[in-house]
Amino acid sequence: MRQLSALMILVVMLSLVMMPALSEAEGMKTIYFAGGCFWGVEHMMALVPGVKDAVSGYANGTVDNPDYRQVVSGSTGHRETVKVTYDPSLVTLSELTELYFSSIDPTVKNRQGNDIGSQYQTGIYYDNEAGGDVIRGLADQEKQKHSAFEVEIKPLDNFWNAEDY
């Protein structure tokens, strides 16, 4: 009986410890930014207050769980992309998207700076239609500023974490 009581106390204590972590995850949103080489985008987004995580990876390609060599070959269709998880009560999707637009050249295709190739194509990939509406509205404003606009705005098809380096 004592073992059962001790076990019950342990279960209750563990559930109380885990509850804040679970509730913190609730309300988080995710957006995916492709802005050339993912390391710079990841670093920039990770510094934003309200961003809980920025993870480099590969989005919207045709191969499951690709590695860098496959992606850089141009044969997989993936874009170097950063998955940004954020708290919308601290930073908005509009603010993140405006920061993204300020950090890229939206007028070129398959290139950012010295990085050239289809894996460096700029894009914003969303996982819910409400986010897509916000992004398309901001993209329309951005298009008015430039003679060309080459940023992909699409639903997210898939995302694979990049290898650790």
What kind of feature is each model-predicted range?
Residues 1-6:
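Positively charged n-region of N-terminal signal peptides that target proteins for export
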Residues 7-18:
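Bacterial N-terminal signal peptides
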Residues 16-165:
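Flexible coil/turn and secondary-structure edge motifs
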